[in-house]
Structure formats: C-alpha cells, structure tokens
C-alpha cells in the first residue's frame, strides 16, 4: 500500500516545480520587458531633446541662404558657406534658440554660436519668439550712409549703456570690427551682420573687453553667427560623460563626482583668481557696470595654463539696460523680479512694481560659486581665513553703505591670500 502512494507524490512534484519555474520565468520576462521599454522611452526622449537642442544644420542653412542672396556678409561667410572650412563639432547648446558648438575654422579650434530666433534684449522667464525671417537682418536698409549707420549704433549704445564712457569711440571700434575684409569700408552686408550682432549682449561685451585676459577673442562672424576663441575646458569643474550615462546618475552623486574631477588646489586657486579679475573687468569699467545674471560653473572654462576664460556671457547685461527694463515690471513677490538666475530686485508691495536696484553684486555671486570649489582640498594653514573671507564676500549687498569700498577691499584681500599661497608652487 505504501508503494502505491509513492508514484502519485513523485508525479505531483514536477508539476509544482514546473509551475514555479514558469512563474519565475514570466516574472523575469516581464521585468526585462519593462526595463527595455522604460530605457527605450528615456533614450527616445533624450534623443528628441538632443535633436531639438542641436540644430546646427538649420542654423547654417538660414545663414548661408542670406549670404548667398547678398543680404549679409562677414569674414566667416565664405568659409561657412562656400569652401566649407568652418565645421560644427560637439554640440554644447543648452537652449534651442541659442546654438553653441565646438568648431574648427581653417584648422583653428573655436566656439561657434548662432541665434535661432529674433534677437530680443532681455527675457524675464518667458520663451523667446521663434526666429522671424521677415525682420531678420532688416537694418540698415539700402541707401543708408556710413554716417547714418554710426548714428544708429550710437543711439543703440546710449539705450543699452546710458551716458557711460566715450560712446563715439566705441562706435568707431564697432565699425572697425564690422569691416570684416579690412578694405577700409563697411558694406551693406557687413553692416547688417554687425547690427544683428549688436543686439546680443555677449557680442557687445566681447568688443568692449577685447583686450582683457579672461574674455574670449572674436575670430569672425557671418550674420548673427560668430566664432569665438576656443577654450580647452568648457566648465569650471566636472567630467564630460555621454548623455546616455548621465541619465542614470543621480544629481546628488553627480555633484559630488564633479567636485572630485577638478584640478589640483593651486590650479583651482589660479582659476578662481581669474574669475575675481573678470569681476573687476565688468565692475564699473569704461562703459559702466555689467551684471552677471547666470553665475554657474557651465559658463566658465579655462585653458591649458589654467587661466580662466568665459565660455558663455549671454546673461551678462549692462546695468543701465536691465534697470530700465525691470523697474516698472508688475510683480506679486520678489520671485517676479528676477532676470536669468542671479539678478534679483525686490517687489515694492505698495506699488506692486519691481524696484530697479539689483540686490546682490557680481562679487558675492562669484564667491558663492567658488566657496565649495576652493574650500575642498584647501591647505589647512589658510582654510579658516579663506572660509572667513569667502563668507564675508557672499554677504555683500548692493544696498550696503560704502559697498564699493567693501567690494574692492574684499576682492583684493581674497586675491592676495590666494596669490601668496600659490606664488611659489609649480602647479600654479
């Protein structure tokens, strides 16, 4: 009797194992399918974003169509549109309307920038309009004399910069830059290109600060496309990874990883000194004060000698221009009175209008950016003093009494502290 019970038990066991195996296999297949589906969806979304951000072919087509019909001209036009010796390389764009690429022009490395919309002066958190072909490169019109063009440029500078410095001298400098073929005359095509470029704060700043060490040099232009001096390292810190890998790295871990991939401390100190010197360059220069409205690591770079070079200056704007445009803006709170990420004014609750005074100066924003960058790995003998000076710097307010004196004192003290520590090191 006992023997007759065994076969049934023996038969039931494989069914149980088979059912369990099928369940495990189905679960495995389901999760495998889910991972593939989610991964494919993420890659598709990111690829779509990439193709939207990186529209170099569209930019080139628009510019070259205008050049070949004689509307615009400039030193980069022939290389871009005829000989094709100006190449677009790695895409660095962060917004579809501001195209940015590493490029090669006649075997020289550079950074190519192109606008994909009608250039507007300032944007307070709204999307810029799509590029309007009807009005692009519409000024100056045919028949405009050189003198009339100079008057147009002078009026534009007065609106942007106020009565700062010798504007007539700046106008003459612009005409020299606009004369791309250096024949002593500015053609209508060159004038149209120059006028379009002058609507861009970055181009204006490059011309004003063309002799300064930390401002990239202008290599050439065609329409509102322009080529800047190349920068070896296009971010203050971090490591460049393929975007597919970036998807799977948590933001907190990414920030920690960025801080690991930085130069040695003496080299970081030299780069930091460069940023402080750039702050000096834009603080009450010959044409007034310029405000840094997006002080982030991605906008700063450095060369192989660890000299700071600005990578993106599009959110550095003339103070006069910003004040004029923001002062009567309707607001509910201080959050409505922001340009870029860093330029903040306050909301006057009695009038529900933004005030014109920016709260935080450039130096305070630069020190905020440099705090973690410099304190990590700082030599123990200066760490306490460095931390103290950085926090004093961050606390600077535009409205403080004797702000300019404090600004100069803090800036000079910081530079002196850093220089003394790195003057005799090989790394610097």
Curated annotation (Swiss-Prot):
Keyword field: Disulfide bond, Endoplasmic reticulum, Membrane, Signal-anchor, Transmembrane, Transmembrane helix
Modification(s) after translation: Among the many cysteines in the lumenal domain, most are probably involved in disulfide bonds.
Membrane topology: Single-pass type II membrane protein
Record localization: Endoplasmic reticulum membrane
Any single Pfam family the record assigns to this protein: PIP49_C
This protein's GO CC annotations: endoplasmic reticulum membrane
Broad class of the protein's primary localization: endoplasmic reticulum
Domain of life: Eukaryota
Ranges of the Lumenal topological domain: 49-428
TM spans (from-to): 28-48
Family, per entry: Belongs to the DIPK family.
Name by which UniProt lists this protein: Divergent protein kinase domain 1A
Gene: DIPK1A
């Amino acid at each position: 009797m006992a023997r007759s019970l065994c076969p049934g038990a023996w038969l039931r066991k494989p069914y149980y194992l088979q059912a369990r195996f099928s369940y495990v296999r189905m679960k495995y297949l389901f999760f495998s399918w889910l991972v593939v589906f989610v991964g494919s969806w993420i890659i598709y979304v990111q690829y779509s974003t990439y193709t939207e951000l990186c529209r170099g072919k569209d930019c080139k087509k628009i510019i070259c169509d205008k050049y070949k019909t004689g509307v615009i001209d400039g030193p980069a036009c022939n290389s871009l549109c005829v000989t094709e010796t100006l190449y677009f390389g790695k895409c660095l764009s962060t917004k579809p309307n501001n195209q940015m690429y590493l490029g090669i022009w006649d075997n020289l490395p550079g950074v190519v920038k192109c606008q994909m919309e009608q250039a507007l002066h300032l944007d307070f958190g709204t999307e810029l309009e799509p590029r309007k072909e009807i009005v692009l490169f519409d000024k100056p019109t045919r028949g405009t004399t050189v003198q009339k063009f100079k008057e147009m440029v002078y009026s534009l500078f007065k609106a942007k910069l106020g009565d700062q410095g010798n504007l007539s001298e700046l106008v003459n400098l612009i005409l020299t830059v606009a004369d791309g073929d250096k024949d002593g005359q500015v053609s209508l095509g060159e004038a149209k290109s120059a006028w379009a470029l002058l609507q861009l704060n970055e181009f204006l700043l490059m011309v004003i600060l063309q002799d300064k060490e930390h401002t990239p040099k202008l290599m050439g232009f065609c329409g509102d496309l322009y080529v800047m001096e190349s920068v070896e390292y296009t971010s203050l810190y971090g490591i460049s990874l393929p975007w597919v890998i970036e998807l799977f790295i948590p933001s907190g871990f990414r920030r920690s990883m960025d801080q690991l991939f930085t130069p040695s401390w003496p080299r970081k100190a030299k780069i930091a000194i460069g940023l402080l010197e750039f702050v000096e360059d834009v603080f009450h220069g010959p044409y007034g004060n310029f405000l840094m409205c997006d002080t982030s690591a991605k906008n700063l770079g450095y060369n192989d000698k660890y000299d700071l070079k600005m990578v993106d200056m599009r959110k550095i704007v003339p103070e006069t221009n910003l004040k004029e445009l923001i002062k009567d803006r309707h607001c509910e709170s201080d959050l409505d009175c922001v340009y870029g990420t860093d330029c903040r004014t306050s909301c006057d609750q009695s009038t529900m209008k933004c005030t014109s005074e920016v709260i935080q100066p450039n130096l305070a924003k630069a020190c905020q950016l440099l705090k973690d960058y410099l304190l990590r790995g700082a030599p123990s003998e200066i760490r306490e003093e460095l931390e103290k000076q950085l926090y004093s710097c961050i606390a600077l307010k535009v409205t403080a009494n004797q702000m300019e004196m404090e600004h100069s004192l803090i800036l000079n003290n910081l530079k002196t502290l850093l220089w003394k520590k790195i003057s005799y090191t090989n790394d610097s």
